[in-house]
Amino acid sequence: MGGMISSAGAAGVINNNSETTNMKENADSLNFEDRTYETRTMKVDGKNVTFRAYENIPYVANPVDTTYQSMNVYIPEAYFHNEKDHKYTAESAPIFLPNSVGGYRPGKAATPTLFKDGEPNAVLYALSRGLVVAAPAARGRSNETIEGVYYGKAPAAIVDLKAAVAYLHKNDKNMPGDANKIISNGTSAGGALSLLLGATGDEPDYAPYLQEIGAANARTDIFAISTYCPITDLIDVDWLAYNTSVGRMKAPGAFDARDNFTGENNLFGTATIDNQHFTKFASFNGDGTAVADEHIIKMMNPLNYIKPNGSTEHWRIRYGEIDNNTSMAVTLIVATRLANYGYDVNFDLPWGIPHAGDYDLEELFDWIDKIVNE
C-alpha cells in the first residue's frame, strides 16, 4: 500500500450548513488501499512516534453526512518497512477503535493529540504502543438538516460504528492491523455504544440500517471492548432511591424524564419528532406523549443482546466511585451477566474517580497487550 503525502479529503453530503444532497458511491469507494496519507511524527514520553495519517475516509457508500460517517486511520510507520513496533507486526497489530461520542450527540473522528500537560490522548498513546488506530465519527441525536429533518436519532450512532467495523473487516488484507483483534473504546454515551458494539456482533436487527447507508458487506463483530462510565440500560434506572454516599443527580425516571426533555428523550426521537419517551411509566405519569418504537429501544440496550457464545471475548468496564451520572449498579449488572456467561471480564470501580474516561491509559493498553498475546 502506498500514497502521496497529502491529506485524504471527502466531499460532504451535508455541508457545514447541513444542506442535504443525494449521494451514491459505488462499492469501490470502500477500498482502503488507494487512500492518500500524510506522514507525521509526535512525541510521547520524549520518544518520537511516527505514523501515517489517513483521514476523512467515508466508511459507507451512501453516507447521509460524510463528516459523521467517516473515520481517521493511523498506522505506525514501522509496519510499512517490515519492522516491529513494540510487540506487534503489520499482520499482528490489534486495531484500536475509539469513538468520541458524548451525551449521544454527534461525535467527530478523533485525532492524535497532546494535552496541555503534555500527556497523549488515547489515539496517540495507542500509536506509541504499536496499535493501528481506526477512529470513526458517528451521527448523534442533534444532527438536523436545514429543513428540520433529524438524521442522527437512535439507532444511527450504533449503526455507524458497526459500519466502521464492517469497513475494517472488508479491508483486512489491504491495510496493516488485524481486523480479528478490534478493541472498541468509549466514555459515557460512547462507553454505552462500545458495550453495545461488543454485545451485538453480527445481530440481524441492524442489517437493514447498514444496507441503507451502504455499509460494506462484511462482519460487524469485534474482539474486545473497553468502556468508561457507560450510560446504558436507560429504561431500568427508575428506582426511588439513589446512592446516598454519592448524592442524587437525577430524579426518579432518571433518563426518561416526565417532561420529555432529557438528552435520552432526544436520542429516541424520529426524523420529524425531536423528543420521545422510551418508558411507558414516564409517558403515563408525565406529559402523555408517545413512546418510541419498541424495536429501536431494544437495539440501544446491550442487555438485550448479551448471551452465551457471543463473538466478543474480552470486556474491560470502569465506573468511577464518585460518578453519580447513573448508578454503579448498572455496570455491575452488565459485568455480572457477562461473567455468568463465561466471558473474560475486567471490572473495577476506581476510588475517587468522577464521570470520566481514559484516565488509566497505561493500564488499559497493558490489558490489551495481555488479551491479544494470550
Where are these regions (language model features)?
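Sec-dependent signal peptide cleavage junction
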Residues: G2-S18
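Catalytic-loop region of hydrolases
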Residues: V13-K87
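Short beta-strand element of the alpha/beta-hydrolase
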Residues: M71, H86-Y104
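Cap/lid segment of the alpha/beta-hydrolase catalytic domain
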Residues: N99-I158, G198-T200
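Alpha/beta-hydrolase active-site loop
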Residues: Y150-N174, D360
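Primarily recognizes the serine-hydrolase "nucleophile elbow" in alpha/beta-hydrolase
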Residues: K170-G247, I297
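C-terminal catalytic histidine-bearing segment of alpha/beta-hydrolase fold enzymes
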Residues: W239-L240, H314-D323, M328-E374
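Long, low-complexity, polar/charged, intrinsically disordered or flexibly structured peripheral segments
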Residues: D259-L303
